[in-house]
């Protein structure tokens, strides 16, 4: 099957390409920069350079494609403007996919709080999902929380914070819960979603990992994997606007990316149902094994100082 992977220079897109090749698919990539594709180590002869926000290159990228993976985000643009950019990109992609006759669209989005109150980041993910679910006959949206992997920006952010802060000052969100998922399991879901039978398509699936934990517990378990001790100080308030700037500086990350991610910590992010692994036939990795694998992969290319 001929498939398109958008965001092919990103963590998930770059890792997905070889998995799709192994499954026997013919893969085309879509990205904004050939330099970023090369830097990500993506081995693809067929890459269309374009921009989903403007629509440039989408027609050529989607031509002759049976299934498309939508892995695009715009969170590193202007802090106040990324939701509008993400919606614009999704609608342009949806229009181009309908025109090209794409049969299936697979989207990786984010878990939504049970109370429906979402951060800007998660509200934007939901708006993108809604646009894409109308764009093909067989759409599938996969909703994940934190993806644990060597190139996952959210995981790397947590590791760098734990490395560089001798004491972890944890706001009120420390007691909120989530279900982080191994990057390998995320990729397996994506591959299987591309060819899943008709009873799996047409809506969204929540793909959490098997271990539910508070954010405080997650930080403690990562610190344990790093073999370091990090005492924590509980704070009574959520100081996300200020804390995100400080945390981004400490971790060496872009504040435009970190601010919306930290806003998402202010709610429980748990799967609505636990049937996705059974439905897709996937055996999930436990959290500690996922962290250890991610750290080992990271150390192949870069020093993780605490180890």
Located regions from the model:
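Mid/C-terminal beta-alpha module of Rossmann-like enzyme folds, strongest
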Residues: 2, 189-260, 271-307
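N-terminal Rossmann NAD(P)H-binding glycine-rich loop of SDR-like oxidoreductase domains
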Residues: 3-25
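SDR active-site strand-loop-helix element
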Residues: 6, 30, 71, 105-110, ...
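Oxidoreductase cofactor-interface core, primarily capturing Rossmann-like NAD(P)-dependent enzymes
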Residues: 16, 23, 40, 115-228
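NAD(P)H-binding glycine-rich loop region in Rossmannoid oxidoreductase-like domains
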Residues: 29, 34-100, 110-114
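Conserved cofactor-binding/catalytic machinery of classical short-chain dehydrogenase/reductase
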Residues: 54, 89-92, 104, 127-128, ...
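A short helix->loop->beta-strand "cap" motif at the edges of active sites that frequently abuts
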Residues: 99-104, 136-137
């Amino acid at each position: 099957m001929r498939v398109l992977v958008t965001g092919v220079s990103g963590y998930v897109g770059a890792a997905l390409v070889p998995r799709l090749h192994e499954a026997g698919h013919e893969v085309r990539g879509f990205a904004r920069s050939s330099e970023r594709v090369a830097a990500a180590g993506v081995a693809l002869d067929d890459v269309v350079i374009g921009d989903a926000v403007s629509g440039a290159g989408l027609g050529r990228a989607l031509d002759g494609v049976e299934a498309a993976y939508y892995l695009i985000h715009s969170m590193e643009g202007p802090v106040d403007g990324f939701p509008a950019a993400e919606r614009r990109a999704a609608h342009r992609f949806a229009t181009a996919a309908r025109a090209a006759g794409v049969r299936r669209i697979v989207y990786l989005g984010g878990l939504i709080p049970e109370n429906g109150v979402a951060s800007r980041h998660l509200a934007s993910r939901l708006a993108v999902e809604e646009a894409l679910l109308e764009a093909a006959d067989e759409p599938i949206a996969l909703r994940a929380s934190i993806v644990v992997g060597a190139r996952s920006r959210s995981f790397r952010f947590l590791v760098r914070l734990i490395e560089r802060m001798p004491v972890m000052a944890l706001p009120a969100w420390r007691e909120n819960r989530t279900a982080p998922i191994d990057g390998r399991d995320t990729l397996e879901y994506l591959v299987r979603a591309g060819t899943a039978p008709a009873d799996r398509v047409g809506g969204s699936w929540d793909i959490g990992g098997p271990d539910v934990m508070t954010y405080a517990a997650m930080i403690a378990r990562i610190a344990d994997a790093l073999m370091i001790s990090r005492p924590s100080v509980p704070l009574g308030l959520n100081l996300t606007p200020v804390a995100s700037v400080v945390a981004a500086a400490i971790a060496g990350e872009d504040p435009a990316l970190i601010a919306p991610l930290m806003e998402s910590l202010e709610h429980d992010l748990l799967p609505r149902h636990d049937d996705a692994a059974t439905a897709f036939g996937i055996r999930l990795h436990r959290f500690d094994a996922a962290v250890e694998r991610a750290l080992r992969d990271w150390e192949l290319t870069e020093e993780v100082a605490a180890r």
